[in-house]
């Protein structure tokens, strides 16, 4: 029974995505909504991304320094581990989980509200492909902004580590710099960016799907937002496992 329901939901998701990409609206109309969605979904998330990443980078640096204190351990190991954690997991995977809660609920509730207030029905009556008009700009906006947010997150985390060096004196800036530069593999950076594209697509499409299929009133919109966050978060975790194995 559960498997049947999952397959039915997945089939409805594929049908909706087919509508989204089958007949896009005019480029001028799409461009205006695309810019608006980039601001709403990406630009408005920059502050929270920078703040969380800054403090996480600082905490990682402190914890590594305090818990791996040994005469046999190089002094720069805190900088090295901080860089690897920020590049490989936190800035791409964990940050996208956080954004799934903020952005995913925003997308689902906005589209769900449009559904229950019959705005989507009005678009259909006017002959507009409502799925493409409402959802496609959000998908493209997320695909544009999430990789940039991942880069901002990594940078902010490194700055947070330097804050512990200059202000907290946990580690010297010279040792931190040595660790950050030690054995740097550019592919790790690109791996995080590549994963973020997949996560952005998952968050945008899954959240839009739950919002678009809302039936009922405001209670249904709230449930759709919750389902969107839970489902997109789980899919981000599953895809993170698969992509890490594939790209490593």
Where are these regions (language model features)?
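Active-site cofactor/substrate anionic-group-binding motifs, chiefly glycine-
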Residues: 41-94, 98
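Selective transmembrane-helix segments that form parts of the transport pathway or gating/packing helices
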Residues: 42, 46, 50, 90, ...
């Amino acid at each position: 029974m559960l498997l049947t329901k999952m397959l039915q939901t997945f089939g409805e998701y594929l049908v909706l995505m087919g509508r989204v990409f089958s007949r896009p609206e005019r480029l001028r109309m799409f461009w205006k909504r695309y810019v608006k969605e980039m601001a709403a979904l990406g630009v408005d998330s920059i502050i929270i991304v920078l703040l969380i990443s800054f403090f996480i980078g600082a905490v990682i640096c402190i914890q590594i320094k305090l818990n791996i204190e040994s005469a046999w351990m190089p002094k720069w190991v805190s900088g090295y581990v901080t860089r690897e954690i920020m590049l490989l997991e936190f800035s791409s995977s964990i940050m996208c989980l956080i954004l799934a809660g903020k952005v995913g609920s925003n997308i689902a509730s906005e589209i769900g509200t449009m559904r229950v207030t019959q705005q989507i029905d009005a678009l259909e009556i006017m002959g507009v492909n409502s799925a493409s008009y409402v959802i496609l700009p959000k998908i493209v906006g997320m695909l544009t902004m999430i990789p940039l947010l991942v880069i901002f997150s990594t940078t902010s985390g490194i700055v947070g580590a330097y804050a512990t060096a200059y202000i907290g004196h946990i580690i010297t800036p010279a040792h931190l710099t040595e660790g950050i530069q030690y054995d740097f593999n550019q592919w790790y950076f690109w791996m995080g960016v590549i994963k973020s594209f997949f996560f952005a697509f998952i968050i945008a499409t899954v959240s839009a799907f739950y919002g678009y299929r809302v039936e009922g009133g405001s209670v249904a919109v709230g449930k759709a937002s919750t389902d969107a966050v839970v489902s997109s978060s789980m899919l981000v975790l599953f895809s993170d496992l698969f992509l890490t194995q594939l790209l490593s």
